[in-house]
A protein has these predicted regions:
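Acyl-donor (CoA/ACP) binding surface of acyl/acetyltransferases
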Residues: 1-15, 21-23, 59, 63-170
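Conserved GNAT-fold acetyl-CoA-binding loop/helix
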Residues: 25-47
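A short helix-loop-beta-strand connector motif used in the catalytic cores of GNAT acetyltransferases and
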Residues: 47-61
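Short helix-loop boundary/capping segments at the starts of domains
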Residues: 22-25, 51
Length: 170
């Protein structure tokens, strides 16, 4: 699966807003701090990535072999002293999920985080019911380390958040 990471930029905003139009469908898989996509929120992410270095977060879009944007990934909540960060991945459209984009994008951003940033530990916080993401990160060598009971409200139901981690050796 060929996937390219591109630093999030102003040119990507219209495509992202269109792809993320069904926010309730997307948000059910996301972390507690997710907000509906807006131009302002995306510009903040661009500024975080392009701002003073080293940044506390880096955001990328995923492009398939034809250049079509299919999702986003990030290295965020970076603790530079301990060289620890969280990794996130989102494939926007249901029709693009299960095609290998998430695995290819995650491998690429993890390799970049270890090789370029020198991060020692990566974490993935995933809803307990998100079996696709749990399987993806377990296949990438992440191990479940904890459960945050009733951490995230989905609709009217509280869900557990699982914390998975991988020691990179960097």
């Amino acid at each position: 699966m060929a996937i390219t990471l591109q630093a999030l930029s102003e040119a990507h905003i219209p495509t992202i807003l269109e792809a993320c139009a069904d926010w309730p469908e997307l948000a059910q898989y996301g972390p507690p701090y997710w907000r509906p996509r807006s131009s302002a929120e995306l510009r903040r992410k661009i500024a975080d990535t392009a701002g003073p270095q080293p940044a506390r977060a880096y955001s990328f879009v995923l492009a398939d072999s034809d250049g079509r944007l299919v999702g986003e990934t990030s290295i965020h909540a970076i603790d530079w002293r301990s060289r620890v960060a969280q990794v996130g991945i989102c494939i926007w459209r249901p029709s693009d999920r299960g095609q290998g984009y998430g695995a290819a994008g995650s491998r690429t951003v993890i390799d970049w985080a270890v090789g370029h940033l020198g991060l020692h530990r990566l974490e993935a916080w995933i809803l307990a019911g998100n079996s696709a993401s749990l399987g993806l990160f377990r296949n990438l060598g992440f191990v479940e380390e904890g459960r945050l009971t009733q951490r995230y409200l989905v609709g009217s139901q509280y869900m557990d958040m699982l914390v998975l981690a991988r020691i990179t050796g960097a």
